[in-house]
UniProtKB/Swiss-Prot annotation:
Disulfide bonds: none annotated. The gene is ELP4. GO terms for biological process: abscisic acid-activated signaling pathway; auxin-activated signaling pathway; cellular response to sucrose stimulus; negative regulation of anthocyanin metabolic process; positive regulation of cell population proliferation; regulation of auxin mediated signaling pathway; regulation of carbon utilization; regulation of leaf development. Disruption phenotype: Narrow leaves and reduced root growth that results from a decreased cell division rate and a reduced apical dominance. Delayed germination after imbibition. Enhancement of germination and inhibition of leaf growth at high sucrose concentrations. Hypersensitive to abscisic acid (ABA) in seed germination and seedling growth. At the cellular level, hypotonic vacuole, alterations in the size of grana and starch grains in the chloroplasts, and massive presence of Golgi vesicles in the cytoplasm. This is Elongator complex protein 4. It comes from Arabidopsis thaliana. Component of the elongator complex which is required for multiple tRNA modifications, including mcm5U (5-methoxycarbonylmethyl uridine), mcm5s2U (5-methoxycarbonylmethyl-2-thiouridine), and ncm5U (5-carbamoylmethyl uridine). The elongator complex catalyzes the formation of carboxymethyluridine in the wobble base at position 34 in tRNAs. Promotes organ development by modulating cell division rate. May regulate mechanisms producing carbon assimilates or importing sucrose. Involved in the repression of the abscisic acid (ABA) signaling pathway during seed germination and seedling growth.
Length: 355
């Protein structure tokens, strides 16, 4: 008599909740059961492999000479409000609600709806019309996930009125108990207890270590808060982005904060009047700053991310739309040689421009 076929179970098993096909706007499925929300910048979503994974902590290191971390916050918050996602915003300002008036508005899309082709024009034109319709359907699917934002146009009231927005002032706070209570209450609304995602939450904390807050001298309390926030995010359908100035922290505390981040970014100012850099980079006059990617979140996998580049230029296309581009080295001596990195691909070699 043949022995029964018994499957041996291992103590090491992958605990991955299967994410069903997203039915709510602003959510996209990824590999290994990962779900993404958009950063509000399409270039950044593409670079990060889809956006910010649900349950992840994003930290942005500020540069006092470049306030472009505010642009990352603005697009992130606007994207959530456009997709009707609840928002918790905390900042060291007396009136944090005033910051909502600076959020950018999604760009108006000028859609040229295709008209049915003339039957007398032949089969080739009919196929071309169907292909054009397919491309527009693909574009509409992208718009449901992410938008291009006009940085010069404020977000209209229709996206602010009646939306679940919680604003918290960290000014003159002696400790982080108020912020901790707000985060715990907010994240309790988005438990990750099933494969079906009903709603998504977004948390944005600006200048976490600002000297305007009394708790800024208690580095151990700040580390404990970030550790607790990350643990709550891991069991929630939410994402938190926290900006902080590393220069105001001790080197050890700054490193520990960076280590706790799932996705770690930094902003660098572009030097004013740097003639050498102007000769080195193409489009130098259009560059507002640099974005460095130090770490990319990896959820449900141990495979590391290999980026084509880690430093990108930040610029405003048409002086309105925030864009990220690989750094391109200008031809030497006016020759038409190959640049350091083309627009289609970025060099992985380290150079003087790696910050």
């Amino acid at each position: 008599m043949a022995a029964p076929n018994v499957r041996s179970s291992s103590s090491f098993s992958r605990n991955i909740s299967v994410v069903s096909s997203p039915q709510i706007p602003g959510l996209k499925s990824g590999p290994n059961g990962t779900a993404f929300i958009s950063s509000g910048i399409r270039d950044l979503d593409r670079i990060l492999g889809g956006g910010y994974p649900l349950g992840s902590l994003v930290m942005v290191m500020e540069d006092p000479e470049a306030p472009h971390h505010m642009d990352l916050l603005r697009t992130y918050m606007s994207q959530g409000l456009v997709n009707n996602q609840p928002l918790l915003y905390a900042s060291p300002s007396k009136d944090p609600k005033g910051f909502l008036g600076t959020l950018p508005h999604p760009a108006s899309s000028k859609e040229d709806k295709p008209t049915a082709p003339d039957p007398d024009q032949g089969e080739s034109l009919r196929i071309a019309w169907q292909y054009r319709k397919y491309l527009e359907n693909q574009k509409n699917a992208i718009d449901d996930y992410s938008n291009d934002f006009d940085m010069r146009k404020p977000l209209e009231r229709q996206f602010l009125s009646g939306r679940p927005i919680d604003c918290v002032s960290l000014l003159d706070s002696s400790d982080l108990s108020i912020a901790q209570d707000h985060c715990a209450t907010f994240l309790s609304k988005f438990p990750r207890n099933s494969s079906n995602i009903a709603s998504i939450g977004r948390i944005a904390i600006q200048s976490f270590c600002s000297p305007l807050c009394e708790y800024s001298e208690k580095e151990s309390d700040m580390l404990s808060f970030i550790r607790l926030l990350k643990s709550m995010l891991m069991v929630s359908n939410a994402v938190a982005i926290v900006t902080f100035p590393p220069s105001l922290l001790s080197p050890s505390s700054s490193k520990r904060l960076q280590h706790m981040a799932d996705t770690l970014l930094s902003i660098k100012a572009i030097p004013d009047g740097d003639k050498e850099l102007e000769k080195l980079l193409t489009g130098y006059k259009d560059i507002n700053g640099f974005l460095n990617i130090h770490k990319v979140a990896r959820i449900n996998t141990q495979v590391p991310v290999i980026l084509e580049a880690k430093t990108f230029s930040m610029s405003l296309k048409k002086r309105r739309f925030l864009a990220l581009e690989c750094l391109n080295q200008a031809p030497v001596d006016g020759s038409s040689g190959t640049s350091y990195g083309t627009s289609g691909s970025c060099s992985s070699k380290s150079g003087a421009l790696d910050f």
